[in-house]
A protein has these predicted regions:
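N-terminal cap/lid segment of alpha/beta-hydrolase-fold proteins
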Residues: 34-38, 148-193
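Short beta-strand/loop motif that positions the catalytic acidic residue
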Residues: 364, 370-372
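Hydrolase active-site cap/lid region
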Residues: 297-345, 399, 407-410
Length: 425
């Protein structure tokens, strides 16, 4: 296993997939852990150096309101301090169990409030998921995949001429799925004759249009970005907004009362169909991988488990991982359904286990490139680390100490470059 920790503290302005890197603010409060790698032993005290800047210059004698909490859990401490000059120290305390401790600092200057976060790990390599593995997990999914035996792929490809370039053709595509539904996506295909690896890009949460990945297709990969809602993905944005507020509102919980009716059953099988589609393309070299973040991270884990033809798996800050952990007093995965203990009905919990990303991670065989950040307030590092730790396939991880629910360009580009290289062997 290769592990690289990049403690970068200056944000670059960039947009990465569906996750936007935050814009640099006028006032910054840097919270710097006293361990260079932000890793501590259980029982060891974590301290943070506080540095306040205004337009990059010292911001002296300002009051800092701060709180300390375990990852995505209620604050254990709320205090205030006044910096001496533009610096100070926060003693955050320790943890008795593996996990992550976070400091949130807020300053008010010239009528505006500015918030910063910094997170450290306490023996995070010892974290493991708390979600239970159903005894018939493998049997259930093997039987469920048999539903595809009766489904005709029946692919359709329509050229989107105004999106094509001198190097890449762009198509709006669709293919068959269970119950008479279809999956839709945007395919980017290198124009030059030859054989290319194929990559399935699975989406983050939401209902939205897709444009296709021309950049990586131009570098020598067939890329298919798919939607999961069974509707075309090149329509007007207003339509997707209306659907997200209407029939697809809170879709991640549709049918959760039963494993056979849950929303993602059709989606997972559609991802397997997408692999069939990619391998059917004449320009494919016979190799296919899958990549995705957040909801897409969960879909990447699930698809790699369900289809062993996949030989490379890219996952960043996966959602739907270790969701059950909330029921045992630890932070669980997005969408945080079980954070409300009233939602912990037996049938809901049992269904979620069959779809939990951590359970798929336990059974992966294809090589995995994994990435997440300690400051992720959507898919917390606790669930990302626990899920990574149970992967037994060949794996490597990139951790961004100050990354949230986004990745630096160097990290996401590194994942794509690794995948193309892996699929070109």
């Amino acid at each position: 296993m290769k592990k690289r920790f990049l403690g970068v503290f200056i944000a670059l302005l960039a947009v990465l997939g569906v996750c936007a890197q935050p814009v640099l603010k006028k006032v910054q409060v840097h919270l710097v852990p006293d361990h260079a790698d932000a890793i501590y032993r259980l029982g060891e005290e974590a301290k943070f150096k506080v540095i306040a800047l205004d337009c990059g210059l010292k911001l002296n004698d300002i009051q800092v309101n701060y709180e300390v909490s375990e990852d995505l859990m209620p604050a254990r401490t709320k205090k205030s301090m006044t910096l001496r000059g533009n610096e100070g120290t926060i003693v955050a305390g320790t943890m008795k169990q593996p996990g992550f401790l976070r400091v949130k600092a807020v300053v008010e200057h010239e009528g505006s409030k500015y918030t910063s976060y910094s997170t450290v790990g306490f023996e995070p390599d010892k974290l493991t998921p708390m979600v239970k593995m159903p005894e018939d997990f493998d049997t259930y999914w093997a039987d469920t995949k048999k539903l595809l035996d009766k489904v005709e792929l029946a692919p359709k490809m329509d050229l989107i001429a105004d999106r094509c370039t001198d190097k890449v053709d762009v198509y709006h595509i669709s293919f068959g799925n269970i119950k008479g539904t279809r999956m839709y996506g945007v395919l980017t295909l290198p124009k030059k004759e030859g054989k290319y690896p194929a990559i399935l890009k699975v989406p983050g949460a939401g209902v939205h249009a897709m444009s296709g990945n021309v950049a990586w297709a131009a570098k020598g990969a067939i890329v298919l970005e798919i939607g999961i809602h069974g509707i075309p993905v090149i329509l007007e944005n207003q339509l997707y907004s209306d659907l997200s507020r209407g029939v697809l509102s809170n879709y991640v919980l549709h049918g959760i009362e039963n494993r056979d009716s849950y929303f993602f059953r059709r989606v997972y099988l559609g991802c397997v169909q997408a692999i069939d589609f990619l391998l059917s393309l004449p320009k494919n070299n016979g190799k296919v991988g899958v990549i995705g973040g957040s909801q897409g991270g969960m879909l990447s884990l699930a698809t790699s488990y369900l289809d062993k033809r996949i030989t490379a798996t890219g996952v960043y800050f996966p959602a739907f991982c270790d969701q059950e952990a909330y029921l045992y007093g630890r932070t669980g995965g997005w969408p945080h359904f079980f954070k409300n203990k009233d939602n912990g009905k037996k049938e809901y919990v049992e269904t979620a286990r069959y779809y939990d990303g951590a359970n798929f991670a336990r059974k992966l065989t294809a090589p995995v490139y994994y990435a997440y950040g300690y400051n992720d307030l959507t898919c917390g590092p606790t669930t990302s680390a626990a899920t990574y730790n149970v992967i037994s396939a060949p794996k490597q991880v990139v951790i961004g100490g100050n990354e949230g629910h986004w990745l630096f360009p160097e990290h996401i580009n590194g994942m794509w470059e690794w995948m193309i290289q892996e699929l070109s062997k």
